């Protein structure tokens, strides 16, 4: 908490910024350079053998309400240690977040925690605030999927988005498959036992740790050779020499022998083109083709990559090499008028870029007040604005019912000179 708040400043208290990701949640205060905590988006329930994921889209409303209520209570009273009634809230969300989830989340915040206001901010748009630019092609490589969305002059171009189920979850599934098929374990009983005979499945936390500590992305030339050897039908393609094997401790009593070939081949699923010739790299190019032709050059020269999966060593270098390799193919060579692609380096780790953008936005008190949904409006209507809904109320009705609008709000929406 900033010092001036502790000295009894009469100004409005800084907002709480929450980036509720499917794997990890980032939480902190507006105006700060980093989140106060990064914790798994799970809760532990009595009688359940495994932790329960909080971000779920296919469960009923009351169950989701219960999960979110318990998780946000942990955020406020175990990590942030502040009164939720005193501070506005900025929620960083995906543009593809289902209405069912966001409505349940806002109901928890307004009805249970009684927060003064809530702002739902798109993660792709918030990422640009950290760079001070208005236009970019933003790729978010998260846990469930990779989602690309062009932003032009501060406006998301919603009809040009693209997504693929290629993210941390897909990497974990591939990693577990290869570990169970190829790896051995040393125990106190015997050496080099097959992994399935020791444990039927690998816990999610262990997969995450192995991925972060041992896996990396090969360069383009090596990656193409690995893919050719993997799909080798006639037996002519040889795999490049693998990196060193790694011994990974399990439970303090077992040693898992991870083959070097697994360390670099797991991540190739992000760049292997499927039956429809789609990969993480083609997502960007396909989205670029859908954009208006006069915006493509500017978007191609301003690529922004966020999300925890993109933090793998070598990911950005490989992504740029893949794009430059694919753009020479007939499918894209004629359609795209530019061959220049550049990736920005945001002033934060890739998994915290969207949170930092929300912290910057939340520190602008006048703008935050003019863009947030107030508690009074929500109590009157029970609704929140949704970009995919055609019957949203007028903008000026959503903010601080019965109160005068902030000066910036007046300037933005008034016709007076």
UniProtKB/Swiss-Prot annotation:
Subunit of dynactin, a multiprotein complex part of a tripartite complex with dynein and a adapter, such as BICDL1, BICD2 or HOOK3. The dynactin complex is built around ACTR1A/ACTB filament and consists of an actin-related filament composed of a shoulder domain, a pointed end and a barbed end. Its length is defined by its flexible shoulder domain. The soulder is composed of 2 DCTN1 subunits, 4 DCTN2 and 2 DCTN3. The 4 DCNT2 (via N-terminus) bind the ACTR1A filament and act as molecular rulers to determine the length. The pointed end is important for binding dynein-dynactin cargo adapters. It is found in: Cytoplasm, Cytoskeleton. Belongs to the actin family. GO terms for biological process: retrograde axonal transport of mitochondrion. Transmembrane segments: none annotated. GO terms for cellular component: axon cytoplasm; azurophil granule lumen; cytosol; dynactin complex; extracellular region; ficolin-1-rich granule lumen. Keywords: Cytoplasm, Cytoskeleton. Part of the dynactin complex that activates the molecular motor dynein for ultra-processive transport along microtubules. It comes from the Eukaryota. The keyword Cytoplasm applies. InterPro entries: Actin (IPR004000), ATPase_NBD (IPR043129). Pfam families: Actin (PF00022). This is Actin-related protein 10.
